[in-house]
Amino acid sequence: MSIKEFDGGLEEGSQEVAIGIDQSLTGFALSVVSIESPNLHKTWVYKSEFRGIQRLVDIYNWLDAKIFEFQYYGWTIKDAAMEGTVLASHSALALGELSAVVKLVLWYRLVEPPLQIPPMTLKKYASGKGTSKKQEMLLQIYKRWGVEFNDDNAADAYALARLASGSAIDAIERETQEKIKDPKYRDFIQ
């Protein structure tokens, strides 16, 4: 297992935060941002040493422990966003299983289903256009928000957390914030 951490200055203490999750099997990324000041963040990329069901259990345990840690720090998680699964992907089944793991952890810890953001919607929010490539996303996140990453999974998780925080600095971001209020971006709870 390896963990890469990006410390954006978010400190322990009573405050509202939002989390973003880019659920990749080879570089699972989690970001937590301050609602009040979304440039303050902590972001991690977790690489499990396992495969198959062991990897799913390993990621479940790691994510569950991190969210417990956030609550221990005094952070109140107001919302969460995860990247929506692309069904046309060659690894759609494995990513669907991982998506279910993430939803279970969030359900048990937060009792609220996360926002599920399609990749094109996330790209438009973070870069201004829905077709940006990975390197362009890294550059645009730095140019728009002044936050630097050298890992595209970490950058995506940060952008998802920022989107979940409700932050918008321009018309494109405000438009995306309005768009994700549609119930189709969140699982329905009876």
Segments predicted by a language model, with ranges:
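Phosphate- and other anionic-substrate recognition elements at nucleic-acid/protein interfaces
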Residues: M1-Q190
